[in-house]
Swiss-Prot record:
UniProt lineage: Bacteria, Pseudomonadati, Pseudomonadota, Alphaproteobacteria, Hyphomicrobiales
Descriptive protein name: Peptidyl-tRNA hydrolase
UniProt site (Discriminates between blocked and unblocked aminoacyl-tRNA): 9
Regions annotated as coiled coil: none
Gene from which this protein is expressed: pth
One term under GO cellular component: cytoplasm
Free-text function comment from the UniProt entry: Hydrolyzes ribosome-free peptidyl-tRNAs (with 1 or more amino acids incorporated), which drop off the ribosome during protein synthesis, or as a result of ribosome stalling. Catalyzes the release of premature peptidyl moieties from peptidyl-tRNA molecules trapped in stalled 50S ribosomal subunits, and thus maintains levels of free tRNAs and 50S ribosomes.
Amino acid sequence: MILLVGLGNPGEKYARNRHNIGFMAADGIVRRHSFSPPRARFQGIVSEGTLDGEKVIVLKPTTYMNESGRAVGEAMRFYKLTPADVVVFYDELDLEPGKVRMKTGGGAAGHNGIRSIAAHIGPEFRRVRIGIGHPGAKDRVLGYVLGDFSKAETADWVETLIEAIADAAPLLATGKDATFANKVHLALNPEPEKKPKTKEKDGDE
């Protein structure tokens, strides 16, 4: 069993914020793989299903971002999981928009949701870092992450990324994190088709 956690802030006001892309990823997985209807549990919203034969719990903490660890810790203890069974989806300022990187352990890099989870279960959980880009100046970060994705961003990469994450999610259930990241990358950056080589014909002289 694994616990997939999407980070964000609860409520319609925040639903389309850049900071909520973790919630969007979680919702995409639930939709794509026909998980159970969401219900309130563990200070969050929970859906259950299977991915590649593995039981999976999807959790969206409703504690607000800064207290996300309370929900994650409660769910992890209930299911008797280890941090290695926990995969967290969250927004990453230090990655270009649409880039996805996998990581296990490490620091929080200023992300309050990650800091809270590490405080409750330790740092050795698996992380899906979803790039949202940086506004360029530190004093603009708060307004940027709590701002909505533009229509152009949504059409250009957000929708494609959420679909790609949902499509590749079974790889996370079986521990193939690097393959997951590569599959998502290729969905957003398809390799150009190689044209078959044609033999040059000798021209008339």
